[in-house]
């Protein structure tokens, strides 16, 4: 089996497990769904489930451990003549565009998260860890120190807030707006120094 085929099979299995978990929780609620239920719906063994996710919450959220490394690599690969803000904004916009192509699962994911505070807490923890990893990449690109200097942590945090704001607005607007455009609006406001809205 070629590496490419093996990777595609792994991605397909991960997606099948995520989709099964998400749909089951949407139907029954988080507490009424077990790992066995998810594995059964996805036609895999519970043992296989744990090769992909540490538990049902992570399966429902579809957490992919490669997301942060991919973002960091994309950020560090951006042209050096871009400012760190421009580079991070471009990476975030590409991510939003990719998310928006999943017109079925992303809206369902956000609806399920909205109904289950435990999932929201888990997602917040994942976002926090992602921002720490991103701050280290910003520090590497700018010659600053993550944790000691404000810039890398602040820029990574601002990127996270911009994405969360866009996702909240996408959800509140029943997914009718374009997610990348909502993200652009957030970055535009931040870049302008958050001027007060006209009365």
Q: What label would you give each PLM region?
A:
Residues 25, 34-35, 56-67, 85-88, ...:
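Amphipathic alpha-helical segments enriched in hydrophobic/aromatic and basic residues
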Residues 4, 28-30, 43, 50-61:
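HTH DNA-binding helix-turn interface
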Residues 117-142, 150-157, 165:
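Amphipathic alpha-helical packing segments from all-alpha helical-bundle domains
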Residues 141-187:
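Hydrophobic/aromatic-rich alpha-helical bundle segments in the mid-to-C-terminal region
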Residues 1-28, 32-41:
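Basic, helix-initiating cap at the start of DNA-binding domains
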Residues 37-40, 49, 88:
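Append "Primarily bacterial transcriptional regulators
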Residues 69-109:
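Hydrophobic alpha-helical connector segments
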Residues 13, 67, 92, 126-130, ...:
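Hydrophobic/aromatic residues within well-ordered alpha-helical segments
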């Amino acid at each position: 089996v070629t590496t490419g085929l093996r990777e595609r099979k792994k991605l397909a299995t991960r997606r099948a497990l995520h989709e099964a978990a998400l749909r089951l929780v949407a139907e029954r609620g988080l507490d009424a769904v077990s790992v066995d239920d998810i594995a059964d719906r996805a036609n895999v063994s519970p043992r296989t489930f744990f090769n992909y996710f540490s538990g049902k919450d992570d399966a429902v959220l579809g957490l992919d451990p490669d997301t942060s490394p991919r973002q960091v690599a994309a950020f560090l690969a951006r042209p050096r003549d871009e400012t760190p803000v421009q580079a991070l904004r471009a990476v975030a916009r590409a991510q939003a565009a990719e998310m928006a192509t999943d017109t079925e699962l992303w809206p369902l994911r956000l609806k399920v998260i909205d109904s289950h505070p435990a999932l929201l807490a888990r997602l917040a923890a994942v976002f926090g860890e992602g921002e720490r990893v991103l701050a280290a990449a910003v520090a590497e690109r700018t010659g600053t120190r993550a944790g000691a200097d404000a810039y890398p942590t602040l820029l990574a945090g601002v990127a996270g807030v911009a994405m969360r704001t866009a996702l909240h607005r996408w959800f509140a607007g029943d997914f009718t707006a374009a997610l990348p455009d909502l993200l652009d609006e957030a970055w535009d406001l931040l870049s302008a120094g958050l001027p007060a809205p006209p009365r």
